């Protein structure tokens, strides 16, 4: 897969990043290099290799599952632009 100039500009627009005409070429090269590396990773045979979550072996830290006092609803919605009865108010998005 190859990224062209139009795709670079579209990605920049979607990411809300201002990209000058001088920056499009280098970005195109970087994106193509990243995609080539990802394609190369797809060819690696990983049959029989166990999945890993970390490069160093470690156990997940667990805490005791206890019921705690809530009562923080007012703190949770404190920075929301609009609330009602400790619920977030959002614009209607489906008719």
Swiss-Prot record:
Which InterPro entries does its entry note?
A: Asp/Glu-ADT_sf_sub_c, GatC
One MF term in GO for this entry?
glutaminyl-tRNA synthase (glutamine-hydrolyzing) activity
What are the record keywords, sorted?
A: ATP-binding, Ligase, Nucleotide-binding, Protein biosynthesis
**E.C. number:** 6.3.5.-
Q: Which Gene3D superfamilies match?
A: Glu-tRNAGln amidotransferase C subunit, N-terminal domain
Q: Which reaction does it catalyse?
A: L-glutamyl-tRNA(Gln) + L-glutamine + ATP + H2O = L-glutaminyl-tRNA(Gln) + L-glutamate + ADP + phosphate + H(+); L-aspartyl-tRNA(Asn) + L-glutamine + ATP + H2O = L-asparaginyl-tRNA(Asn) + L-glutamate + ADP + phosphate + 2 H(+)
Subunit info here reads: Heterotrimer of A, B and C subunits.
What's this protein's name?
A: Aspartyl/glutamyl-tRNA(Asn/Gln) amidotransferase subunit C
Q: What is the lineage of its organism?
A: Bacteria, Pseudomonadati, Pseudomonadota, Alphaproteobacteria, Hyphomicrobiales
